[in-house]
Structures are given as structure tokens and as C-alpha cells.
């Protein structure tokens, strides 16, 4: 049965699908007051992911983070009611090497907003654990929102066996080893995105991006140091460094 047109929760009407991930589909929706919303509907056997995203995202309140409003059910499947984030996923929004084109200002603003969102998350003792282009929605002016918390959890969280969390191209070395992750692990992903913006391509897995003969090189190196004990792990400091090097006022 088509989901579009169905009403879930307290008067939230599903309108159209926005996108699909490996274990969920997201619908654009409108609540009873006419406000745009998103509803993330999980495959039935991924109920634990829905629970994790609810636990991590429900208390977050930052303009650059999508908010998890409540748990709902769609045809018996676990689902979450979210604030609606505008924009396109990062790799769809930007063409090759945006940090070296007329898009530089917008792209660096996207990264600054991402760092602001991560700073709020880290301040609550949480790590995102899947910083990647598909989880960053960017608008035409560069404004950005970080989404998807179904892999998120407490910093330093341990599991019964080594667990590799995240997406390979953006994983920190410690994530590939299955170690507990911290704020510096999220910032490694930001560094990979900065490197992509400067070089126009993702390098070999596990190899930090090389210098780009750009004023942003020192920040790039600090974010992608393979040794997590030396890597920059303070999102607020990284954001201020980025803004200073980029000459951005915000």
C-alpha cells in the first residue's frame, strides 16, 4: 500500500519520499499545523537503530542539527518524526573541488556549520560516528544541517566485540580498527571532506589527504592526523580555526 497520503502520529500526513538509505526511507510530511516535517521509516529488523537515534537525537537543540521530535509507527514499522532540513546532500550540492572555485565561501560555510553541529553533539557527551556527505544537507548559500543519528552514541562506548562504525571512505583509523570512538573520530571525517574540497577526489582508504598549497593546509593536517592522540578533537576550536583561515565572519 502506498505510504503517501497516510496520516501518522498526531495528524502528520506523509506527502512524498525524500530518499532511501540502507535500512530506512525518509518521507516529506506536513503536521496538523501545516509545518513541514520529515518521517524516517525503518525496516522492521532495524528497530534498534530507531531506538538509538531517538535516544541520541531527542534532546538535541541546535540550528545545524535535525531534531528528533518523537517516535511514531507507520504500518507497524518503527519510525521517527523529525524536523525538516532543507538542502541537498553534500556531494549533490557541490561540484568537484569546491574549495578552489567560486563555491569556496559556501563550501567552507558548510564545514563551519558541520563543526558547530558536532560541537553541540560532543558537548552532550555524544559522537555522530558517521560523518559523510549523505548525512549533510547543504543549501545554495552553504548553510548546512547534520542528520542521521542511528549510529550515534556516547563517546568511548564499548561493544562486546570490535565494531567498525561509519562509512569506509570517511572512517578514522581507530574506527577501521573497531576501537571506541571520540570527538576526534568525527573530526577526521570533517578533515576528509575538507581534503575533498581542496583536491576534488577522495584518496586511498586510510591515507590522509596531502597538502594542497592552500592556507587551509595546517587545519587539514590537524584534522586528519592518523594518531588520534595528536589529532584535533575540539570542534569549536576547529570551527574558529576554519573561519579565521577562510576569512569568514560567522
Task: Map each language-model feature to its residues.
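Activation segment signature within eukaryotic-like protein kinase domains
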Residues: 110-111
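Conserved catalytic-loop aspartate of Hanks-type protein kinases
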Residues: 186
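AlphaC helix of the eukaryotic protein kinase fold
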Residues: 46-59
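ATP-binding glycine-rich loop module of kinase domains
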Residues: 23-25, 30-48
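Conserved short submotifs of the Hanks-type protein kinase catalytic core
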Residues: 75-89
